[in-house]
Structure formats: structure tokens, C-alpha cells
Amino acid sequence: VRARAQGYPMDDAACTLETDDENLKAVFELCRHTIRVGVQEGYLDCPTREKGEYSGDLAVTSLAQVYLSGDTRLLRKAIEDWLYSANLTPGLLAVFPSAFQQRIADYSLLMPEVALRDYAHTGDKAFLRRTCDAAGALLKVFEAYAREDGLLEKVVEGWNLVDWPANLRDEYDFPLTLPIGEGCHNVINAFYIGAVRA
């Protein structure tokens, strides 16, 4: 019997945890191993099912991967691919590179924050300027849905995803139908505020 293991190369000395708490050590090692084997040539939470990077996975996983490895190359490539999707829609795609042109409004709004993450680790002002141009175009897309008070309503620029099972939504009962229901959807507005602040 043979098995082949592969993963993104990581220097274990790039990020260490000093604690006497054995449970915390175990959690840290589990997280490190998860990033090592779960991050391959892209940020995929299920490489056997997903054939492109989802920007939501990128936003979460890159945070841990960059701190654990000190390596920003994969993050930069993912942002480049994400920005390239603006050639198809200024609202950005949720999956890239991919022929599957899915738009998830919430995920698109993560781009400015992820771009700032790259800058925080690289200090690359030229790349930050490029991402600022894309972020400006992205925010213009969403400003079209702004009410008088600045909150967004009836955002139809892609799917409004609340990635929680219905039984775990803590009675959040906003109609997440396609197209989105009437009213002010808190989740998309939280992402929008985060994008504007970034």
C-alpha cells in the first residue's frame, strides 16, 4: 500500500507557538497541518470538488497561511486572478480562475480587505494602487444599491450568500431567495461597510 502526500511548502520555524497548554499546542498543530495539506496551488477547501478558488475561502485561509508560512506568493497570485475577473464583471467573480462565472456579492466585497492583507505583509505600494483601482470600481457597483441612509438594499449583483445552515441562523429570517428578498439585508451591509473601511 502506498500513499502520496503533498502540500504547500512551509517553514515550520516561520510561525511558532510557545505555551504550556497541551490542548492549545494540539489545536495549533492541527491548524498548521490543515493549512499545509489544504493549501496546494490555490486556496481550496475541497480540492476534489472545487476546481477554482472561492474568494471566501481565500479570505479566511490566506490569513492563516501567510502568518504560518511567511510566504505571500500564493496570496498574490490569488489576488491577481481575482482582479483579472474584473474583465468579466466589475463586481468580480467568486471563483477564479474558472469558467464557472459565479458571482457572490458578499465574497466580492472581501477584496479590499484581502488586498490590504497583501500590503501589510509585502509593503508593495504599486500593487496596492492597482487593487485600489479595482476596489473603487467594485464599490461603484454596490453604491448603485444604496438607500438614502447609505445602507444597501436589494443587491442583485450576484448571489447574497449567508453560508450558514438554516437551523444555525439564530432566527435570522431574511429571505435569501434568488433574487434577494425585500428589505435591508444585514450580512451584505456588514461586508459592504468592511469594504468601504478597507
Residue ranges and their predicted role:
Residues 63-67, 113-120, 194-198:
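Short glycine/serine- and small hydrophobic-enriched flexible loop segments
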Residues 5-30, 36, 43-92, 121-187:
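Active-site acid/base region of carbohydrate-active enzymes
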Residues 52, 105-106:
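Short helix-capping and inter-helix turn/linker motifs at the boundaries of alpha-helical repeat units
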Residues 26, 30, 77, 106, ...:
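Generic alpha-helical secondary structure signal
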Residues 94-103:
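Aromatic/His-enriched, Gly/Pro-containing loop or helix-boundary segments
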Residues 44-47, 97, 108:
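Hydrophobic alpha-helical segments with strong N-terminal bias
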